[in-house]
From Swiss-Prot:
HAMAP family tied to this protein: CH10
Protein name: Co-chaperonin GroES
InterPro entries named among the record's database cross-references: Chaperonin_GroES, Chaperonin_GroES_sf, Chaprnonin_Cpn10_CS, GroES-like_sf
Native organism taxonomy: Bacteria, Pseudomonadati, Thermodesulfobacteriota, Desulfuromonadia, Geobacterales
Keyword Cytoplasm carried by entry: yes
Amino acid sequence: MKLRPLQDRILVKRIEEEQVTAGGIFIPDTAKEKPQRGEIVAVGNGKKTEDGKVIPIDLKVGDKVLFGKYAGTDIKVEGEDFLIMREDDILGVIE
């Protein structure tokens, strides 16, 4: 199944954080916070204005992005976990 977000929504796959610190300390799952980084896997066409024009999304598939801790909605597609969020939820692009 392929999922295509609508309007200004973006489908993001979380990038998991390291499980071991630089000092070699293992971080158990119970002590980890949700990652706030991800890779864009699909984007919508853009936001529609009141007069019907479409404002295209500035992001593209493959961009690595930062987003807020509580941004987006968790979804599962074919057994994989993703976030679907609006373009406004993206804080920045990692270059």
